[in-house]
A protein has these predicted regions:
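Basic, amphipathic juxtamembrane/active-site segments
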Residues: 234-243
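Gly/Ser/Thr-rich active-site loops/lids in small-molecule metabolic enzymes
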Residues: 92, 243-248
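Gly/Ser/Thr-rich helix-start
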Residues: 84, 231, 248
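Histidine/acidic residue-rich metal-binding segments in metalloenzymes
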Residues: 15-225
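Active-site anion/phosphate-binding pocket segments in diverse small-molecule metabolic enzymes
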Residues: 227-235
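Metal-cofactor-binding active-site regions of metalloenzymes
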Residues: 1-15
Length: 248
């Protein structure tokens, strides 16, 4: 089953709204500029207000471009070690906070695409608790991989193990490999360092972020797992790490 999602703004440029009512009449079930954020808060406010009247959600790619400008991977110890410019968690979180506030103001349904940070999960959880119409998704790669995968063979490999069984009751404490900071059942492959297959948007985050996403999925803060499918040609990937097209 395939359902169309219309663009929020013309050309996904973040400036002028599309003819949302006509697109809903034509069959669109939601609106998104996914891949590009709606940076202007006034434009997003208007989009949410119209969407509320039309009874459809806005799906938001949350990224503050002034904070993520020039990024190659998640900002942290690994990016420093590899000499790559970072995309801080705050670049996602400040826009999640903004869009939740605007959804609360307008009464609209906001859907946060590809949440990747612990702070983002916390913001969505708090908004749900106070009754904001917010839903969220996470991707398989953000639920299972960390920024250590960018290290590839520079990291310390350990023997793979079977994934843990689901918890029977209460919160399960996850065991980590101290050398890698990864779940014991998930370890990096022998990828070369700077392998561009690990460059995605938003970037692979820290182990703490993965833990928070999994906990959010378990407690209902994260409503869905979405692929965020972004296929690219070999030409787009076989280049310098920071210039490679992000996506899996």
């Amino acid at each position: 089953r395939v359902e169309p999602i219309g663009a929020i703004t013309l050309g996904r440029a973040g400036k002028n709204l599309t003819e949302m009512a006509e697109l809903v009449e034509a069959g669109c079930i939601a609106f998104s500029d996914d891949g590009s954020p709606v940076s202007d808060p006034a434009v997003m406010r208007n989009a949410l207000a119209y969407a509320a009247m039309l009874g459809v959600p806005i799906m938001s790619h949350c990224e503050d471009l002034t904070l993520s400008r020039g990024w190659a991977m998640h900002e942290g110890a690994i990016s420093t070690r590899l000499g790559l410019p970072g995309y801080p968690a705050a670049a996602e979180e400040v826009q999640i906070a903004r869009d939740i506030a605007l959804a609360e103001m307008t009464g609209a349904h906001i859907h946060i695409c590809h949440v990747s940070t612990a702070g983002g999960v916390a913001l969505v959880r708090a908004a749900k608790e106070r009754g904001v119409r917010v839903t969220a998704e996470a991707t398989p790669h953000h639920l299972t991989l960390t920024d250590r995968w960018v290290l590839g063979s520079l990291g310390e490999p350990v023997a793979p193990r079977e994934p843990p069984a689901p918890p029977t009751r209460g919160k399960r404490k996850r065991k980590h490999e101290p050398e890698l900071g990864l779940p014991a059942w998930l370890v990096p492959t022998r990828l070369p360092p700077y392998d561009t297959s690990t460059r995605v948007s938003p970037p692979l985050r820290s182990d703490e972020d993965v833990d928070a996403l999994i906990e959010g999925l378990r407690d209902g803060t994260i409503d869905a797992i979405a692929t965020d499918h972004a296929p690219h040609s070999h030409v787009d990937k076989e280049c310098e790490y920071g210039l490679a097209a992000p996506g899996i």
